[in-house]
């Protein structure tokens, strides 16, 4: 009920109005702003005047904190959540229009830095494209609800990311385990898209250096692309020329998937060519990795594709 939720929010504000590193963590703060504003009927409606003043002050204070910290955040996903929270705050408060402008500026930079000219992640990570799509659609819906003018670049990038979503999920209805991708279960997202009237199609058999050859019963999907540059290789798996084969909706040949938790040995193992169904050349992994200053693996020696020919 409103009373219970607002009591929790009020207690949080009283305890955490001043900054502390635990409760004002960048990602946590971003999600808290989105949660409180998205559920305003519970967190805000029918509250006392003093509660509303305190609520508005803490939301705007947290949004400014995110804006001051965002350039320090390297992870694209955390930045995307923070940018979304900043934009939502700007849309929710008429006197905070500067947050919309600054949030959109950071969104453009995040897209420009992480996505190529065709709207696909420079990391070649399929899951990253879905994450970008989800947040851009969320931001688009906020603009519609607020009845404020939406910039064209949001629709443009949703179109390109939708092409990726159709190719890697809608067309095949399973998760291809390439380059950091794991089992994602996008069925709930499909229902969300349908409810909001989004529909994406991609009838091509090649997209962003991945190839999908299929008929009604079988599907062969293959990575035919080069490795990404070092700065985008934190989750890259040395899977060039790796493939998966599906028959009647069931995987017959599959790659290993990506081990994302903090175990260097298992992470390193999941990124070698040896755990892929792959065309092996000279008994070597297609890429070599090294640990950076943060003990994270990144590409040392990558792979370039000089020429390819696909016969469908």
Segments (PLM) and residue ranges:
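Aromatic-lined, polymer-binding surfaces characteristic
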Residues: 1-158
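Short alpha-helical segments and helix-capping/turn motifs at coil-helix boundaries
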Residues: 18, 228-229, 263-264
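Short alpha-helix boundary/capping segments
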Residues: 24, 29, 233, 237, ...
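CBM-like, beta-strand-rich accessory domains located in the C-terminal region of large
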Residues: 30, 261-312
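Short amphipathic alpha-helical segments with coiled-coil-like heptad repeat character
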Residues: 40-41, 173-174, 287
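A short, hydrophobic secondary-structure junction motif
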Residues: 60-67, 244, 282, 286
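Short, solvent-exposed loop/turn segments at the edges of secondary structure
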Residues: 81, 238-240, 274-276
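Carbohydrate-active enzyme catalytic cores, enriched for enzymes
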Residues: 87, 116-254, 258, 300, ...
